[in-house]
Amino acid sequence: MEMLNAIILILFPIIGFVLIFSFPTKTLKAKTASPSNPTSYQLIGSILSFNKNRHRLLQWYTDLLRLSPSQTITVDLLFGRRTIITANPENVEHILKTNFYNFPKGKPFTDLLGDLLGGGIFNSDGELWSSQRKLASHEFTMRSLREFTFEILREEVQNRLIPVLSSAVDCGETVDFQEVLKRFAFDVVCKVSLGWDPDCLDLTRPVPELVKAFDVAAEISARRATEPVYAVWKVKRFLNVGSEKRLREAIKTVHLSVSEIIRAKKKSLDIGGDVSDKQDLLSRFLAAGHGEEAVRDSVISFIMAGRDTTSAAMTWLFWLLSQNDDVETKILDELRNKGSLGLGFEDLREMSYTKACLCEAMRLYPPVAWDSKHAANDDILPDGTPLKKGDKVTYFPYGMGRMEKVWGKDWDEFKPNRWFEEEPSYGTKPVLKSVSSFKFPVFQAGPRVCIGKEMAFTQMKYVVGSVLSRFKIIPVCNNRPVFVPLLTAHMAGGLKVKIKRREQCDSMYI
């Protein structure tokens, strides 16, 4: 089967070149276009440039966007298809809010993730999306869910995360801190979403099969979008070969595992009768009368969103703090100022400097590097870029964080103070700026803005505070890590660290 997979990958370029050379030579001349757009040819579009840069797409797109006066580029694809990529905040607002209904995710996008996420909230449009959004928004605004989530967070940090890190200190071990944070986040999101405890933070145990299946399914689903020839992954799926065979097996594991948990939960609820004490999302969705498949798709979507985004953001923040001792010191000062009674929910909301650090880390290393919609009808972006019906339209948080026009000449510096109205000074309460979500769209914006945004900040601030007050995180490698974008981004090779217990442990403040 692997041989057949290779044949498919070889066959498509051959067919493409046969088609190219079936046309007059003049069709191979580059089309006249903006100098900021990649070189494009009739029929094959920019596939040559795309293929040349496919292993550095982030930097390639960012370089091209810097050359563009409007911070927007057009990438021509095979047979006339186009992708418009923008780092212009006005365009982002138009796509995500002003003309929201003209920019659904679209069938090409939902096809990519449909096998894994089905019709879940993050992979649906129209009435299906709207109905799920209303239900989820209602649940996420409930005080009971907020308190339930915070209690789980506190238990996971105190009873699992801190002991794991303490053990690493005592044994002098090097640990992959990215892996620790991913396992921690998976435990938390499964408890909140499913009311089920995978207990995967024990590093002496092998990675649970469900966790590995999620990783494989997410990676291969994301790589579908990077195929130079869009149809390749569909042919591989039809033939059940190569990566698509592995994807099918991983998705089967995910779906069967989650469905088994759902059936057990339904049985528990049927026996118990009253669901008032069942606070997890699964219990809430089942109580609302939704079918098993719809509930499965919804909770898988929330698990995918909740497990990787927060762990990715925190991984990059801890690395950035290791390079900026002065910033780490200011976070510790903020923690000390909260007193010795422990951090409650309201205390976390007031940790503005820690939040600024998280925002700055996500500006430079966004958990979701890009997101795409599809134009339902012809349109014109605010910068004058014309759109055709069916165009793929991508806004690009990674590139936006690197635009001088958006963030100034110091865009490449890690400066949490840029998020304040005035430079924070000792003894004064710093006031965070109101930064447009279209300038900083890491949580999306408009009607699709992330409904778990505040919950995510709560989790990240609590974890950062709990860890930093007790430990110094020291990367063992001095090289700059490599940012890898998939469904959610991660650090290539993980973040290998030594952990040192602080001489004056400030854990009394957590």
UniProtKB/Swiss-Prot annotation:
Heme binds at residue 450. It catalyses: a jasmonyl-L-amino acid + reduced [NADPH--hemoprotein reductase] + O2 = a 12-hydroxyjasmonyl-L-alpha-amino acid + oxidized [NADPH--hemoprotein reductase] + H2O + H(+). Induction: Induced by wounding. It holds the Pfam family p450. Its cofactor is heme. Its EC number is 1.14.14.48. InterPro entries: Cyt_P450 (IPR001128), Cyt_P450_E_grp-I (IPR002401), Cyt_P450_sf (IPR036396). It is a single-pass membrane protein. Plants overexpressing CYP94B1 are jasmonate insensitive and present developmental defects in all organs. Hydroxylase involved in the oxidation of the plant hormone jasmonoyl-L-isoleucine (JA-Ile), a bioactive phytohormone of the jasmonate-mediated signaling pathway. Converts JA-Ile to 12-hydroxy-JA-Ile. This is Cytochrome P450 94B1.
